């Protein structure tokens, strides 16, 4: 549900061909490519999948003032979508699904010089909110303005992922998982279980919008 390739993410070393190859080795049913820049058409995705049976979907990871948001099924990028309010308004009118990506990365145990973008601006003393999912859900209204919360991110600590899952539970929000892979090494380290069998980016977006997803941590042992 969350991976980057060399086609649209300058910080990625993962080619689309290698992505498809590794995903098939892992018996994944599908992969959603969420580039930092640019997007894929369904026709381009089908060409890359090249008859392997792997379903490929397109989205975009957008950095907003409150954190990173995955916009699944984004038909085009427009100026101003880096503002969270503009992004939610655009999504509402265009059938786009929004997923808060790794919302609490660097929150529970931040590395030196880094902080969680989502919680850094809270006026409440950080110790009171450190691991309190109910307080965080109440203090951050943006978490209830997306369709799902990423609760199993392969590039985020277990503690931060667990806090995301707990907060989603408080909000009654559905969850997703994604590797956030920028190389072949991380593919499959965060997964999403989806009700039904979406085959296009629009169908995947609709599944997320109606809450038909669930985060699954770890690589798969078999197709699911």
Residue ranges of predicted features:
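Flexible loop residues that form catalytic
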Residues: 36, 103-104, 154
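Charged catalytic cores and adjacent phosphate/nucleic-acid-binding surfaces used
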Residues: 1, 5, 9, 16-21, ...
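Non-catalytic interaction surface on structured domains
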Residues: 24-31, 46-58
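Internal, conserved structured core segments that host functional sites
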Residues: 92-109
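Active-site flanking residues adjacent to catalytic metal/cofactor-binding acidic residues
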Residues: 1, 34, 60, 101, ...
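Ordered, amphipathic secondary-structure segments that act as subunit-interaction surfaces
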Residues: 81-85, 101-102
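Short, flexible active-site-adjacent loop segments at beta-strand->alpha-helix junctions, enriched
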Residues: 60-62, 75, 102-104
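Divalent metal-dependent hydrolysis catalytic cores, especially in the metallo-beta-lactamase
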Residues: 20-40, 96-99
